[in-house]
Design a protein with these regions (language model features):
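Short, charged N-terminal beta->alpha structural module
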Residues: 2-40, 108-111
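Short, flexible beta-strand-to-coil junctions
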Residues: 11-15, 58-64, 152
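Conserved N-proximal alpha/beta basic substrate-recognition cap immediately N-terminal to
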Residues: 33-140
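Active-site nucleotide/adenylate-binding loops and adjacent lid/helix of ATP-dependent enzymes
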Residues: 94-184, 202-205, 217, 229-262
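A short catalytic or substrate-binding loop motif that flags glycine-/basic-rich loops and adjacent residues
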Residues: 151-152, 189-193, 270-275
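Phosphate-binding site of ATP-dependent enzymes
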Residues: 169-228, 277-294, 298-302
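ATP-dependent carboxylate activation and anion-phosphoryl transfer catalytic cores
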Residues: 206, 252-314
Length: 314
């Protein structure tokens, strides 16, 4: 039987990702190829006649239409995920809308907020400037708010605001059309934060789940951004991970990630993924109380993927 070649796939060639992101994804693809006894063929080329349908390692979750055109029909066809709409791959789905008449894109699930419940922090997703300001007003009653671009990664594209003037400074430059399509998240701001990474990877019938903590560093703009994770892995799914967790904070992070995972898959049934990762924040609210909640999902290769593949090989 001809083994399926492994290829990397770039979703948007107009966007230039960081060099370490490209190199990291190629290294993951090469390891996956070796593990599968197949060849790594570099970036996918639509003009090439592959000996067998490729196994894809994309740089982002794929919309279902594009996935089908590439021959991706199940989670076994890629290291990553497939979504019914582009916004479903972002942190937009973490929160509900701030009011009943708020605007939302086609395919938006109002059930997600109900399903996920208190597994997330207090916050809202907005697809218009007016809705975003309404969300900010409500959250500022409880202290500071964090405004987050839905497509931001690694902690980028975020600003903490303390009043409406600061909020306007952040929101005014936003493009209305992009806001209507992609949205913006307004969320309570936490201090003294620890961020857990909880994930599940399935490759070739093998399942690996893990929980770890993230490390951050200040970038050139003075913002805290992701710079790596330390993870503990177990064979099996989230149930095995929950049984393995010894510390209370780890068990809680795993439980919240499982609830978010179930809510997302139930609310957006077109999602399938071989890599499902969830960031869970634990920190202090402005009133000093401990707050814990899932920040976002990642259904694409990420910063921990190199370790994930090595662990599943072990």
């Amino acid at each position: 039987m001809t083994m399926r070649p492994v290829v990397t796939y770039v979703t948007n060639r107009k966007r230039t990702p960081p060099g370490h992101d490209i190199l990291g994804r190629r290294a993951v693809a090469a390891r996956l190829a070796a593990m599968r006894g197949a060849a790594y063929k570099g970036d996918w080329d639509g003009r090439e006649a592959y000996d067998a349908p490729p196994y894809f390692v994309p740089d982002d979750a794929l919309e279902v239409g594009r996935a089908h055109r590439l021959g991706i029909a199940t989670a076994d066809d890629l290291f990553g995920g497939v979504v019914p709409h582009a916004f479903v791959a972002t942190k937009a789905i973490t929160h509900g809308l701030c009011r009943d008449d708020a605007t939302a894109p086609e395919g938006w699930s109002r059930e997600m907020a109900t399903c996920v419940g208190d597994a997330v922090l207090r916050g809202y997703t907005a697809f218009s400037r007016d809705d975003a300001l309404a969300a900010v007003r409500e959250l500022l009653d409880g202290g500071e708010a964090r405004i987050k671009r839905c497509d931001g990664i690694g902690g980028g594209g975020q600003e903490v605001v303390r009043d409406l003037d600061e909020s306007a400074r952040v929101l005014d430059p936003l493009d209305d059309e992009a806001l209507a399509a992609g949205g913006i998240v307004v969320e309570e701001n936490l201090g003294d934060v620890t961020t857990f990474s909880v994930g599940l990877v399935t490759i070739g019938g093998l399942a690996l789940s893990y929980c770890g903590t993230q490390r951050t560093v200040r970038n050139g703009h003075g913002h805290e951004v992701y710079c790596g994770s330390t993870i503990d892995c177990v064979r099996g799914g989230f149930e095995a991970l929950a049984a393995h967790a010894l510390r209370d904070d780890v068990r809680r992070a795993v439980d919240l990630a499982r609830r978010y995972d179930a809510a997302a898959l139930a609310s957006y049934p077109g999602v399938y993924a071989s890599r499902r990762n969830y960031d869970v924040a634990s920190g202090r609210g402005c009133d000093g109380t401990l707050r814990v909640g899932v920040l976002e999902q990642s259904w694409r290769p990420g910063g921990a993927s190199g370790a994930e593949v090595l662990a599943i090989e072990a």
